[in-house]
Amino acid sequence: IESLRRFDPDGPLDAVQAVIPMTGEVIEIRLAAPRPHVLQMLAQPQMAIFSRDGGTGPYRRKAWGKAIILTPVDRLSGGDEPEETPIPVWQTRVIRAERAALAIVRFRERQAALVLGGRLTDLPLLVPAGIDRNAVRADPVQGLLGLAVTGRGRLLDNAAVRAAINMAIDRSQLPALLPIGGWATSDRLIPDQLDLGRPPTEHDWAALSMDERRAQASATITRWRTDRGPPPPLRIALPQGPGATLLFGLLRRDLGAIGLTARRVPLSSDADLRLVDEVAAYDSALWYLGRVGCARKIHCSNDADAQLQAASLASSPTERATRVAQAEALMVAHNGYIPLGAPIRWSLVSKRLNGFLPSPRARHPLNHLFRRTN
C-alpha cells in the first residue's frame, strides 16, 4: 500500500489508516473516509499477498531452462483427484519473457499459443511478420498515452510554448502509423466524464483546424525566438521499438513545422518530453490527475496540486468532486501533459484459446484461457 501511495498519493489508498491482521486468512483495512475505488485498487496484481511458500494464485511454478512451468495448485494440494492422476496438458502453462520480435515469430510458427504485453512500440512488427489479423486482440483500455513535460528552463517554463507544442501535434495521423482496431486518438487529459461531475475540459484551441493550430503555434515560437534567440532542441524520451520510431518521426515533423527541433533520447536519459504509457487502474479522474501531478516530477500547476490535496481532505463527496474538477481544469490549462490517445495493448491469441477475453485493464489470468478453468 505504501508503495502504491507513493505513485498515486491522491488515489483511493490515501485514506488507509491501518492494516490489521484479524486471523490467519483475514486482514482489516481501516479507512479515514469512504473511497469508492478502493476495491479496484486492491484487485491490482501489485496487491497480491505472499507467504513463505509463495503467492496465493492458482499455480505453482518451476523453472525449465529459460522458461517457467506453471502447474495448477489444486493438483498439488490434495484436490478431488489423486496426485498421481496426470495433469491434462491444457491446464499446464509454459511461459517465457522475450523480445517482441522473437515472441511474434514463435507465435507465427505455432510454437506459442499466446503472446501478451503488446504495446505501440512493437505493433508495426505484426504486418511484416505475416500475422493473421484475426489473431490480434486489442484490449479496450483507457489510461494515458502522451508526453509529459519534464524539462525546465526558459523555453518550457513559458506557458504559451507548452500550449504551442500541444496544439502542433497532428494526432489524426497516428492511426495510420499504428493501425489497430478500436483505438482512438485524443487531446483530452481525461477521456470521459467519469466522476468529474461534468464533461472533461477542452483546450481553447480544440475547435481550430490543424492549419489554424500550426499557424498559432508557429507565431508563438517566432515571438519566443525574436525575444530570446533560437530555442534549444527538445529532448524526447521514448522506448525502443519501431512504433516509437514512427511516433518520433511524426513528432519531429510536427514540431519542426512550428520552428522547434527534436532529438530522441532513451527513457533512462534526462529529457524535456517523456512518453507516458499507462493503463488506468481504476475509473476515476483522480487516477489521471495523480499520474501527471507534481508528485510525478512533471511540469505541474501548484494550484492544481493544492486542489488535489484539498480533495483528499474533503469532508463530503460533493466537496471532493468540486475540488477534483477545479484541479482538472487547472492541469489542462497548464499543458504539462500532452495527450495523444488511449494506451495501446494487444495480444496474439490462438484460436484454441476459446476462453480468452479482451480486458479493460489489459489483465489476462492464465487460468481463464479456456472456457473450462482450473
Where are these regions (language model features)?
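Extracellular/periplasmic solute-recognition and catalytic clefts
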Residues: 65-69, 93-152, 277-279
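A local structural motif
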Residues: 29, 82-96, 230-235, 253-265
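Alpha-helical secondary-structure segments
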Residues: 109, 141-188, 232-244, 316-335, ...
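Short, solvent-exposed loop/beta-turn-alpha elements that line the ligand-binding surface or hinge
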Residues: 39-63, 80-87, 126-142, 148-158, ...
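Periplasmic binding protein-like
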Residues: 107, 248, 253-298, 311, ...
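Solvent-exposed coil/turn segments that connect beta secondary-structure elements
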Residues: 24-26, 32-36, 44-45, 64-66, ...
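Structural transition elements
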Residues: 181-224, 242-246
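Gly/Pro-rich hinge or "lid" segments in bacterial periplasmic/extracellular proteins
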Residues: 24-26, 31-93, 98-102
